[in-house]
C-alpha cells in the first residue's frame, strides 16, 4: 500500500540574505513523505528564487501530478524540473534504502562580515581549513584585499570564492591585482568570475587563479572536460536534478581529473542533511559546501547536528495533498 503526503514550509530568513539583487525574506519549499508498507522516504522540493528555472508553483504542480501517479503504483517520470527530480528521487532512494545514512557534516564556513572576527573563527577551525567567501557584492578591489589578508594571516587556509558571474573582465583583473601571486595557489577555486565562460577561462589562464564551473553546469551546452585553469565543478542538486544525474556529473568530473563539490541551494535542514549524506557517498574526500543553515531561523523535520535552531515538526507544516 502506497501513501503520500506533500507538505509546504515557509521559514523566515535572517536579515540581509540577498540573491541576485533580491532580498530573500522567507525560504519556501515542499516536503514529500512517501510510505510503502512500513518503509518511509522523505525529500525536499525547493526551487531557489533567481536561480531555478521553475517557480515553486510550477514545482508543486509537477510534484502533485507525479505523486498521484506514484500512489497509483507508477514510477516517477525522468523528465521533471530539477528541484522536483531531486526531491522525488531522494524520497524514493530513502524509501528503497539506497541513500546511505553516513553523512559528511563538515562545512566550508561561509565567511561574511568583519575580517577580524573571521580570522578568529578560521584560526579556531579544527582539521582541514577550507572556507568560502562570496565576492562580487562590493568593489572587486576590496574583495581582493580581504582575500589577500586572510590567506596571508592563515598559512594553512584554502579559500573557495564565488562571484556568480558578477564581474566584467576588468573588475576580475582588479580583484586579482590585490591578491599576491604567491598566495593565489591557495585559492582552491573561484566560481564563475566573469559574465562569460570564455572570459573566465582567460582570467584563469592569465592570473593563475583556478576557477570552477557552477552556473554553467545547468546550461544545455555544458560538457565536463579537463581544461587549463579549471579545477572543480560545483554541483547543486536542487538546480541540477535527480540523484542519478548528480551521480553521473560526479563520475564525469572525477574521470576528468577535477574536484566535484556538492553544494547547497539554501535548502531546509532536511534537504541539507540529505546533501551531507550524498556528499559522504559520492565525494567523500571533498568538504561539501553546505554552510547555509544559519541563514534561516528554523530547522524543518530533520535536525542538523549541533544546530541550536528550533525545529518544525511535520505536524506543524501545512498539508498540500494527501493520498
UniProtKB/Swiss-Prot annotation:
Entry's Gene Ontology molecular function annotations: magnesium ion binding; O-succinylbenzoate synthase activity
InterPro entries documented for this protein: Enolase-like_C_sf (IPR036849), Enolase-like_N (IPR029017), Enolase_C-like (IPR029065), Mandelate_racemase_C (IPR013342), OSB_synthase_MenC1 (IPR010196), OSBS_N (IPR041338)
Pfam family, one: MR_MLE_C
Cofactors: a divalent metal cation
SUPFAM superfamilies linked: Enolase C-terminal domain-like, Enolase N-terminal domain-like
Top-rank taxon, per record: Bacteria
PANTHER family: O-SUCCINYLBENZOATE SYNTHASE, O-SUCCINYLBENZOATE SYNTHASE-RELATED
Stated name of the protein: o-succinylbenzoate synthase
Organism: Pectobacterium atrosepticum (strain SCRI 1043 / ATCC BAA-672) (Erwinia carotovora subsp. atroseptica)
Amino acid at each position: 500500500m502506497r501513501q503520500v503526503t506533500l507538505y509546504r514550509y515557509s521559514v523566515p530568513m535572517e536579515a540581509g540574505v540577498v540573491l541576485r539583487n533580491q532580498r530573500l525574506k522567507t525560504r519556501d519549499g515542499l516536503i514529500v513523505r512517501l510510505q510503502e508498507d512500513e518503509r518511509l522516504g522523505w525529500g525536499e522540493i525547493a526551487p531557489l528564487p533567481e536561480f531555478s528555472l521553475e517557480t515553486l508553483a510550477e514545482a508543486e504542480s509537477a510534484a502533485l501530478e507525479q505523486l498521484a501517479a506514484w500512489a497509483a503504483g507508477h514510477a516517477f517520470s525522468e523528465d521533471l524540473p530539477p528541484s522536483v527530480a531531486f526531491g522525488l528521487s531522494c524520497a524514493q532512494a530513502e524509501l528503497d534504502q539506497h541513500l546511505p545514512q553516513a553523512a559528511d557534516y563538515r562545512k566550508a564556513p561561509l565567511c561574511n562580515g568583519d575580517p577580524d572576527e573571521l580570522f578568529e573563527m578560521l584560526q579556531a577551525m579544527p582539521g582541514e581549513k577550507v572556507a568560502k567567501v562570496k565576492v562580487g557584492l562590493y568593489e572587486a578591489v576590496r574583495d581582493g584585499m580581504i582575500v589577500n589578508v586572510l590567506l596571508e594571516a592563515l598559512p594553512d587556509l584554502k579559500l573557495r570564492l564565488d562571484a556568480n558571474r558578477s564581474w566584467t573582465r576588468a573588475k576580475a583583473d582588479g580583484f586579482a591585482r590585490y591578491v599576491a601571486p604567491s598566495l593565489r595557489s591557495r585559492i582552491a577555486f573561484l566560481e564563475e568570475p566573469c559574465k562569460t565562460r570564455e572570459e573566465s577561462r582567460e582570467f584563469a589562464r592569465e592570473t593563475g587563479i583556478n576557477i570552477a564551473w557552477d552556473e554553467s553546469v545547468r546550461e544545455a551546452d555544458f560538457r565536463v572536460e579537463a581544461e587549463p585553469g579549471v579545477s572543480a565543478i560545483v554541483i547543486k542538486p536542487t538546480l541540477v536534478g535527480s540523484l542519478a544525474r548528480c551521480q553521473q556529473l560526479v563520475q564525469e568530473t572525477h574521470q576528468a581529473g577535477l574536484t566535484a563539490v556538492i553544494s547547497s541551494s539554501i535548502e531546509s535542514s532536511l534537504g541539507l542533511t540529505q546533501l551531507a549524506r550524498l556528499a559522504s557517498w559520492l565525494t567523500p574526500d571533498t568538504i561539501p559546501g553546505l554552510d547555509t543553515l544559519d541563514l534561516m531561523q528554523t530547522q524543518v523535520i530533520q535536525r542538523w547536528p549541533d544546530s541550536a535552531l528550533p525545529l518544525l515538526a511535520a505536524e506543524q507544516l501545512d498539508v498540500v495533498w494527501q493520498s
